[in-house]
């Protein structure tokens, strides 16, 4: 029952992808391939990164600091609502949260995939098997083993669900 630091901070990562990530991973791989350091890939939509200062962050919405939201329920709610409102790929803003001695910068969401891009993702030769590092049965896989994806996203605003944070509010099929 407490607010944890951003996974970006606790993991020590230079860059994190949020959302479904297919487009972001290609953009990042291409940048790395031409020699751009991960810590300098600050321009890809659908990513988050650490910044020591805001000199290279131009337009953004500031939310209350981690320290404040972890100790003030009203500040937490306000920060969540700002994050929720900015999940639209077309109008969503870059979010900045002070976090200790620096800032967590969350770029605006990535655009939804086109129909052809989405078809290409689901045409990949998935095995429907767990990663080889798992040696024991994973009960949660039984439920989805033979599932079909008919669409992504959800326009609902259910209080108990975070699907829009993962797949967005735009229905893609």
Residue locations for each model-derived region?
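Glycine-rich beta-alpha loop elements in corrinoid/cobalamin-binding modules
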Residues: 1-100, 104-107
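Radical SAM [4Fe-4S] cluster-binding motif and immediate context
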Residues: 85-173
């Amino acid at each position: 029952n407490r607010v944890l630091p951003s996974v970006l901070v606790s993991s020590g990562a230079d860059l994190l992808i949020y959302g479904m990530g297919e487009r972001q991973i290609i953009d990042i791989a291409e940048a790395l391939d031409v020699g751009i350091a991960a810590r300098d890939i600050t321009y890809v939509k659908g990513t988050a990164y650490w910044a020591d200062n805001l000199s290279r962050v131009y337009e953004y919405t500031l939310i209350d600091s981690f320290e404040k939201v972890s100790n003030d329920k009203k500040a937490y709610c306000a920060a969540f609502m700002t994050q929720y409102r900015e999940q639209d790929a077309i109008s969503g803003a870059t979010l900045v949260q002070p976090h200790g001695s620096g800032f967590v910068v969350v770029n605006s969401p990535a655009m939804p995939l086109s129909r052809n891009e989405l078809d290409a993702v689901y045409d990949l030769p998935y095995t429907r098997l767990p990663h080889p590092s798992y040696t024991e049965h994973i009960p949660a896989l039984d439920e989805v083993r033979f599932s079909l994806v008919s669409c992504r996203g959800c326009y609902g605003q259910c209080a108990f669900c975070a699907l829009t944070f993962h797949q967005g509010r735009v229905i893609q099929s």
